[in-house]
Amino acid sequence: MDSVAYIIVLAMALSVLFFAIAFREPPRIEK
C-alpha cells in the first residue's frame, strides 16, 4: 500500500510541476 501511495504522490507532484510550467509560459506547441 505504501508503494501505491508513493506513486500517487509522485504523479501529483509531476502534474503540479507540469501545470505550473504550462501556465507560466504561453503554449508554443501547435497541433
UniProtKB/Swiss-Prot annotation:
Membrane topology: Single-pass membrane protein
Entry keyword set: Membrane, Photosynthesis, Photosystem II, Thylakoid, Transmembrane, Transmembrane helix
Family matches, as Pfam families: PsbT
Any GO BP annotation: photosynthesis
Cellular localization per UniProt: Cellular thylakoid membrane
Cellular component per GO, a single term: photosystem II reaction center
UniProt key word Flavoprotein: no
Superkingdom of origin: Bacteria
InterPro entries: PSII_PsbT, PSII_PsbT_sf
Disulfide bonding pattern of the chain: none
Transmembrane segments annotated in the record for this chain: 3-23
Task of the protein: Found at the monomer-monomer interface of the photosystem II (PS II) dimer, plays a role in assembly and dimerization of PSII. PSII is a light-driven water plastoquinone oxidoreductase, using light energy to abstract electrons from H(2)O, generating a proton gradient subsequently used for ATP formation.
Family: Belongs to the PsbT family.
Subunit structure: PSII is composed of 1 copy each of membrane proteins PsbA, PsbB, PsbC, PsbD, PsbE, PsbF, PsbH, PsbI, PsbJ, PsbK, PsbL, PsbM, PsbT, PsbX, PsbY, PsbZ, Psb30/Ycf12, peripheral proteins PsbO, CyanoQ (PsbQ), PsbU, PsbV and a large number of cofactors. It forms dimeric complexes.
Protein name, per record: Photosystem II reaction center protein T
